[in-house]
Regions:
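Bacterial N-terminal signal peptides
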Residues: 12-21
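Gly/Ser/Thr/Pro-enriched helix-cap/hinge segments flanking short amphipathic alpha-helices
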Residues: 32-37, 348-485
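Hydrophobic beta-strand segments that make up the repeating blades of beta-propeller
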Residues: 55-62, 112-116, 168-173, 228-232, ...
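A short loop-to-beta-strand structural motif that recurs across blades of beta-propeller domains
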Residues: 69-71, 126-130, 179-183, 238-240, ...
Length: 549
């Protein structure tokens, strides 16, 4: 098994760092407490653990001043700004606003696609594909074949041919001749434009051939193949079903939406009937522009149930997301604009904005568990939102594909607890934000998941039974059982400064987030190059995860 390499800065003493090598093998309380980001003026976000330390990080785009921000989760509720690590890869005019993590090369770490993101077509430029090599990002878009110059504003990862390699679909705004593009992953680090042969050489409007709205890829007709939903700004929204033979076929559904100002989209099974429903957030101020709750009827048919489920949003709706923020077993709904939080009460949505959080922030529109307590935290425009919990139980599941793509994008998980059955599908982004690629199940007062079925894109089906609640587990495709997920823990005892000629002895306790089953630490080294020492000094093992220098 290949050696995995994880780098984490743990000492504030100059630039002293450790490198570690792993061998594979209450009543009245609001739901969220909010904390403003250091750079609050940002737009979209992608959530994921880019350095494999067990703590999810965030990449933010459309930021004032820096354009983008890469924030590293320190594991103590704080985030360190790592934007400088990727700043040199960013074109001068890039805004971002369309970003998604995924392990496109199946090497075990999250790579990052960043859409150019400028809505001015005359200032279009290239997109970025940032390959992650042990926590170091390098733009490889040109060598990977992603050379088209467009005003791309969002993208999704999917494995449309189910060959185990993630493909990419991009939304491109602009002139009538512009098209959205589908890139097939060749499995060798390169991509090929297969838009035409896949049946997607489609003009979405007379003014702009591309969609200029949110995208979502998911299995909308329950046949095991990922389909495409395309929200179109000022034109009809579209649904393309995957025929399993390499082509997409457009399905006409009247209730998918009139030609309004479609913006973002939320995807999830809000009625717990086992299929993917949609919430289409739509801008504008007319009745034509109202947002839509679209109930999946199967076979590509959707029913507009917006008023029936208690939602009436007409004015300028933008970013949105589904997540079970109260852990009761059904998906709640949030809107960044207008600022609204809806609680799902058995299929009826109730506005609980005033009870959800306090502070002068828009609510969260993407979801993750950044403090690893099992409850869904939120990410918004200007702030992150810590879920205070309510005593209900949860289960979180992280997938690792073997025959399927590494992230398990496209996999379906069905959790059964007594009479409660919930379905989650791992998505490779959606719209202008990306949720953490971890399936979260709120269980209410239930303390055990009776049965967990995982349907992988490869066709493999794994079944686990009798899983205790209140934990995060990792499931490897085709392996029996599951593995508990534990984050990295680092403890160091160091002097305040180094003195020339003096003897220095350091001790560090290392308990990393080992990724593979049976993995173990092979060695720990210190990089002293920025304090006048060598680049690599091996520490001596003292037992129980303790190493000395």
């Amino acid at each position: 098994m290949d050696t995995a390499y994880v780098r984490r800065f743990i000492f504030s003493l100059c630039a002293f760092s450790l490198l570690i090598f792993l061998a594979g093998g209450a009543e009245g309380q609001t739901i969220f407490s909010s904390t403003a980001w250091q750079n609050p003026e940002c737009g979209g976000s992608a959530l994921g653990d880019f350095d494999n330390d067990g703590w999810p990080d965030v990449f933010r785009t459309e930021c004032r001043g820096t354009r983008v921000a890469l924030m590293h989760n320190e594991g103590d509720g704080k985030f360190a700004d790592r934007t400088g690590d990727i700043q040199t890869a960013m074109p001068d005019k890039l805004l971002g606003y369309g970003q998604t993590f995924a392990d496109y090369d199946n090497d075990g770490d999250l790579d990052l696609f960043v859409a150019f993101g400028n809505w001015n077509y005359s200032q279009r430029d290239r997109n970025l594909l940032l390959r992650n090599d042990r926590g170091v990002f390098t733009d490889v878009a040109q060598e990977a074949g992603l050379t088209d110059v467009n005003a791309t504003d969002n993208a999704v990862w999917l494995d449309y041919d189910r060959d185990g390699w993630l493909d990419l679909y991009t939304a491109n705004l602009g002139q009538p001749e512009v098209r959205n593009l589908l890139y097939r992953n060749n499995g060798d680090g390169t991509f090929a434009d297969v838009t035409a042969e896949a049946g997607l050489d489609v003009s979405f409007s007379e003014e702009a051939g591309g969609s200029n709205g949110a995208l979502a890829a998911g299995d909308f007709n329950d046949d095991g193949w990922p389909d495409l939903y395309v929200a179109v700004f000022r034109a009809r929204n579209r649904l393309f079903l995957n025929d399993g033979q390499g082509r997409f076929v457009e399905i006409t559904s009247e209730d998918l939406g009139d030609p309004g100002q479609a913006f973002d989209v939320a995807v999830g099974d809000f009625d717990n009937d086992g299929d993917l429903d949609l919430f289409q957030a739509t801008g504008g101020l007319s009745q034509e522009d109202r947002s839509l709750v679209l109930l999946n009827l199967g076979e590509g048919e959707f029913l507009d149930v917006t008023e029936a489920v208690g939602i009436s949003v007409v004015g300028d709706a933008q970013d949105t997301g589904f997540g079970d923020i109260d852990d009761d077993g059904d998906l709640d709904l949030t809107l960044g604009q207008p600022r609204t939080v809806f609680r799902n009460d058995g299929g009826i949505f109730v506005d609980i904005t005033d009870q959800a959080y306090s502070g002068d922030f828009a609510p969260p529109v993407a979801f993750w568990d950044y403090d690893l307590d099992g409850h869904l935290d939120g990410q918004g425009y200007r702030a992150r939102f810590l879920n205070n919990g309510n005593g209900f139980h949860t289960l979180q599941v992280e997938l690792v594909g073997i025959e399927s793509n590494r992230n398990g994008i496209g996999a379906r998980l069905i959790a059964t607890t007594g009479e409660l059955e919930q379905m989650r599908e791992i998505l490779g982004g959606r719209g202008f934000n990306q949720d953490e690629m971890v399936a979260h199940f709120g269980l209410g007062e239930r303390a055990m998941v009776d049965r967990l079925e995982i349907r992988w894109p490869s066709g493999q089906v794994d079944v686990l039974t009798d899983i205790p609640a209140d934990r995060k587990i990792r499931v490897f495709e085709g392996h029996e059982g599951y593995y508990p997920v534990k984050p990295s823990v680092w403890e160091a005892i160091l002097p305040d400064s180094l003195v020339a000629g003096a003897v220095f002895q350091g001790t560090v306790a290392v308990h990393p987030a080992l990724f593979e089953p049976g993995a173990e630490i092979t060695r720990v080294v210190a990089d002293l190059s920025q304090v006048g020492g060598p680049e690599e000094v091996e520490l001596t093992a003292a037992g129980d995860g303790v190493y000395r220098l």
